[in-house]
Amino acid sequence: FAIQFYEILVGFGVAGTGFGVILAVVGRASSQENRAMSLAIATASGSAGQIVGPIVAVFLLESMKWQSVFMIFAVSILLVLLLLPFMRAPERASKDEIEESLSEILSIALKDPSYMMIFVGFFSCGYQLAFITAHFPALITEMSAPIDPAGWCGDLGIETTAALGGFAISVIGAANIVGTLAAGWAGKRYGKKWLLSGIYAGRSIAAAWFILTPITANSVLIFSFSMGFLWLATVPLTSGLVAHIYGVRYMATLYGIVFFSHQMGSFVGVY
């Protein structure tokens, strides 16, 4: 029970420091014209942390126990609090936002087909991401064609299909940073709903192509980069769309509800 209790606390900690809270703060502190790019930078930074974090953890584990490494990461996260005084959100919301209470905004949003489409779309996003993260490496390990030592895999030191599966996840993470920043740049110039539609369509096309193609190192690399480029590109566009439609005053609550659908999709995808 004690272990499960700590796991629950970790879940609350992740929720309290996740995209729902961070993007709301960034969204409120950003101007309308720069909001999409600001949200993209915040999202991409999280992806960069997922790349750098494991490398640092492995380095530290060579010289200390995992408990000490855990405490080092915890303290480093607490140090982020020192940056809070530099965050400058608008002192007051617009007149329209002040006149509408949270209950009124929620009532409007829950009856709005656009909000429901965002909700459903983010559910599918969570399903796709969690499904690939949980099952893609195992699929490559079991189903991929043998590695050619004379090919690019051999040049990178990838000798087994299991290593190729781990490399594929790394490619997804690296491409995700580029794709997220590109989505933020595009969201400033083009309609967010059309960009989101294109991203979801692109994922479907990439998945269909991979399923219908023999699984080789080359197809794994192409699919990993394509899916990685579209991985979290939905986040700055979705959060920016919520802020654009309903304002930033209750963005944390409204985006939190949408992100809840993302997590439900993630659960279904892993299960």
Each model region followed by its residue ranges:
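Hydrophobic core of transmembrane alpha-helices in multi-pass small-molecule transporters
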Residues: A2-T17, F123, S219-A233
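Glycine-rich segments within core transmembrane alpha-helices of 12-TM secondary carriers
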Residues: A36-P54, G256-G269
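Extracytoplasmic gate region of multi-pass secondary transporters
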Residues: D112-A183, G269
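Cytoplasmic helix-loop-helix junction between adjacent transmembrane helices
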Residues: Y6-A44, G247
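Flexible cytoplasmic inter-helical loops of multi-pass small-molecule transporters
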Residues: R88-E104
